[in-house]
């Protein structure tokens, strides 16, 4: 399922140079523009959220019982979490966990819905993920990603992952990735329209003049940085300007470090209910 805010109405005569002027904030259409296939086992922490037979959002395993995603993704009472997925056509190494109700979902209490700040959510799974399982070729099938510790910067070179539509508009069978340049709130604010619903709890990916904005990944999916201590989840895909395949504006993410206390407290409070 795809999520959209109110998009700009574009006619065929509008030139690419004018698209940024009419672009509107919206949720990503789940696209990896100018990306390439990820290596198997490169991102064992990413999960696919599926309702019925359809992928609707991404997420990241942060503990054996917990997945971190965008708040706007948690709209269904029941859905499946598919971990260990690399190729859509091969589910031989996947682990599937069922979410049976809202009692397994936590959306940030200050998230107001739609495009805006505090777009973050947690999912609890009753059956823990097996984080020690290996695929048939010996790669890690499922693993958790590190949350930022503050030791390393959240900005700089990063990577984005997702199964979204590619340049041609087709959904790839293989997990895709894209190298991105991560910028902080102030720099992102200067690159966006003055009325953009940006908040200090956001970070962005941006390459000036490049058309690789909000299409770059599934809502709720991970933006990571590779550090000497492992892969850190620095951002969660939140929103970007639409039409995403044409705008040169930044993509906007929930900045994970801004919610480290909320994540910790939410998990601890939930544990007391079990």
Curated annotation (Swiss-Prot):
Expressed in the midgut. Gene3D superfamilies: Trypsin-like serine proteases. GO terms for molecular function: serine-type endopeptidase activity. Residues 32-268 form the Peptidase S1 domain. Induction: By blood meal. Residues 1-16 form the signal peptide. This is Lectizyme. Protein with lectin and protease activity involved in the establishment of trypanosome infections in tsetse flies. Binds D-glucosamine and agglutinates bloodstream-form trypanosomes and rabbit red blood cells. Capable of inducing transformation of bloodstream-form trypanosomes into procyclic (midgut) forms in vitro. Keywords: Disulfide bond, Hydrolase, Protease, Secreted, Serine protease, Signal. Its EC number is 3.4.21.-. It comes from Glossina austeni (Savannah tsetse fly). GO terms for biological process: proteolysis. Coiled coil: none annotated. One of its GO terms (cellular component) is extracellular region. It is found in: Secreted. InterPro entries: Peptidase_S1, Peptidase_S1_PA, Peptidase_S1_PA_chymotrypsin, Peptidase_S1A, Trypsin_dom, TRYPSIN_HIS, TRYPSIN_SER. The active site is at residues 72, 119, 219.
């Amino acid at each position: 399922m795809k999520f959209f805010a109110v998009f700009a109405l574009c006619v065929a005569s509008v030139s690419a140079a004018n698209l940024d002027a009419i672009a509107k904030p919206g949720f990503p259409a789940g696209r990896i523009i100018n990306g390439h296939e990820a290596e198997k086992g490169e991102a064992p922490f990413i999960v696919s959220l599926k309702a019925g037979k359809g992928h609707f959002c991404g997420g990241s395993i942060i503990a054996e019982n917990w997945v971190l995603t965008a708040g706007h993704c948690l709209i269904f009472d029941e859905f499946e979490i598919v971990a260990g997925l690399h190729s859509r056509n091969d589910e031989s190494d996947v682990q599937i966990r069922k979410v049976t109700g809202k009692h397994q979902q936590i959306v940030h209490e200050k998230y107001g819905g739609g495009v805006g700040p505090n777009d973050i959510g947690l999912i609890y799974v009753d059956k823990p993920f097996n984080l020690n399982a290996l695929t048939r070729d010996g790669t890690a099938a499922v693993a958790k990603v590190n949350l930022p510790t503050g030791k390393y910067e959240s900005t700089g070179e990063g990577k984005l992952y997702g199964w979204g539509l590619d340049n041609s508009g087709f959904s790839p069978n293989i997990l895709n990735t894209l190298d991105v340049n991560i910028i902080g709130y102030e720099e992102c604010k200067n690159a966006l329209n003055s009325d953009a619903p940006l908040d200090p709890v956001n970070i962005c990916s941006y390459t000036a003049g490049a058309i690789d904005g909000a299409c770059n990944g599934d809502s709720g999916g991970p933006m990571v940085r590779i550090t000497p201590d492992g892969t850190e989840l620095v951002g969660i895909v939140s929103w970007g300007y639409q039409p995403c395949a044409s705008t040169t504006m930044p993509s906007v993410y929930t900045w994970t470090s801004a919610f480290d206390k909320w994540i910790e407290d939410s998990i601890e409070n939930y544990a007391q209910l079990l």
